[in-house]
Amino acid sequence: MRTSQYLFSTLKETPNDAQVVSHQLMLRAGMIRPMASGLYNWLPTGIRVLKKVEKIIREEMNKGGAIEVLMPVVQPAELWEESGRWDQYGPELLRFEDRGNRNFVLGPTHEEVITDLVRREVSSYKQLPLNLYQIQTKFRDEVRPRFGVMRSREFIMKDAYSFHTTQESLQATYDVMYQVYSNIFNRLGLDFRAVQADTGSIGGSASHEFQVLASSGEDDVVFSTESDFAANIELAEAIAIGERQAPTAEMCLVDTPNAKTIAELVEQFNLPIEKTVKTLIVKGADENQPLVALIIRGDHELNEIKAQKHPLVADPLEFADETEIKAKIGAGVGSLGAVNLNIPAIIDRTVALMSDFSCGANIDGKHYFNVNWVRDVAMPEVFDLRNVVEGDPSPDGKGTLQIKRGIEVGHIFQLGKKYSEAMKATVQGEDGKPLVMTMGCYGIGVTRVVASAIEQHHDERGIIWPSDEIAPFTVAIVPMNMHKSEAVQKYAEELYRTLQSQGVDVIFDDRKERPGVMFADMELIGIPHMVVIGEKNLDNGEIEYKNRRTGEKEMISKDKLLSVLNEKLGNL
């Protein structure tokens, strides 16, 4: 491709509204342009990367036995009503009517459509297992689109759905897809972790997220220093270590009129925060016990996903308001504690090991100091309620936990029969009776993959594609002052034609630009291999080579250039 025949839309300055690196560089590199909030045009450089990512995904999905289909973006409301999600899905679901006043949605996901398709096309257990996938546009009406294509309203996704007669069959395909996803992200050159995850609004049982580690990520990824354990922070088990120490002082009631938060209590009374607890009041699952107290250490954070799994706690978790708390307990939120508490309490594992701690007295403006379990207050039920922190023991007993930010680029679920039962998707079983199919679901955010690769691989000059396979071009030919040197132009043209004939994805910068501008543009868009042709070097029989990823520069004899290039491109 010649730049003179290409839409080469690089920018020198970073747009003010671009907050994260990937958004900034995708705009500067001329990969995308905004059209409306959360909607983007993909320009030639961007679409080249996107298509290469899709190619890798297709190849690995096909190797894993999945079969490609294509389903409509526009979906009839009846399918969503049948699954029950018409009423469950929030405002992210864009609903509209056609000219016949029939309700439709722009698909944020395709569980309903694929279930309807398979129940029409598959009638016997002999046709299963079956794994179908598509690469298709999705739309979610995000309340606050941000970070460019990282969280946009319209995006491209690879979604696959598998159908089975047994849980064992689903598990086998799930394991295959886990490996397929690992292969995809390894080929993309991404530093990622496959983590245990919550199933969220899609539902189901087992679930793994594939998280690309990056400081701009929205998720906390927890992993062990000495094993392959990894989990989303929502699911990472918090292990309490040590033993409860014997009391060393008598419990006493202290006036604390100006200490309504843990921070104020610690500062005003010079207490170690590890010797304080905080009491959070949430709605109960049972109308006979409308309020429940959750007690965690003062420096820990409540894990709402874990807490709402306790049978006494309402799911989804909902905090009680000040009026409800005051009416039931007689004190405000800054003075709550375990002593003389008149509602059920659940304490975190770490709290169960505490002694001589401080907590609210359930009297406004007062706290108890030197509280001890059993001696001063009966030990409540113990449950894992908190988020893990860095340095906690790994739940598998190997090493300690590290926490890094992650960008979710893939998610696999064992859906079970959530959709097939609701939509009566059955096949004839071996015994001749109707059998409800068991389902799996496997998604990759294709556009998000592009952004996450940039988040993880860039420098002050621009993008560094982690794999030659996804760079917009593999080789850049940069002839300096070509329009003033017949020798440079002739050699550049010959090299361009030769590389093209060898199937190399090459961009030939034939613009009438200063060399500095040409170098800057090629580095900005991240071309892995740059061949610089200058008149003086050419007279000496040499060509300059630059490697974007390693920063390597070397002079190569022009007679050996092709063989050296072929060697450097051998990973393709």
UniProtKB/Swiss-Prot annotation:
It is found in: Cytoplasm. This is Proline--tRNA ligase. It comes from the Bacteria. Catalyzes the attachment of proline to tRNA(Pro) in a two-step reaction: proline is first activated by ATP to form Pro-AMP and then transferred to the acceptor end of tRNA(Pro). As ProRS can inadvertently accommodate and process non-cognate amino acids such as alanine and cysteine, to avoid such errors it has two additional distinct editing activities against alanine. One activity is designated as 'pretransfer' editing and involves the tRNA(Pro)-independent hydrolysis of activated Ala-AMP. Homodimer. Gene3D superfamilies: Anticodon-binding domain, Bira Bifunctional Protein, Domain 2. Keywords: Aminoacyl-tRNA synthetase, ATP-binding, Cytoplasm, Ligase, Nucleotide-binding, Protein biosynthesis. GO terms for molecular function: aminoacyl-tRNA deacylase activity; ATP binding; proline-tRNA ligase activity. The keyword Aminoacyl-tRNA synthetase applies.
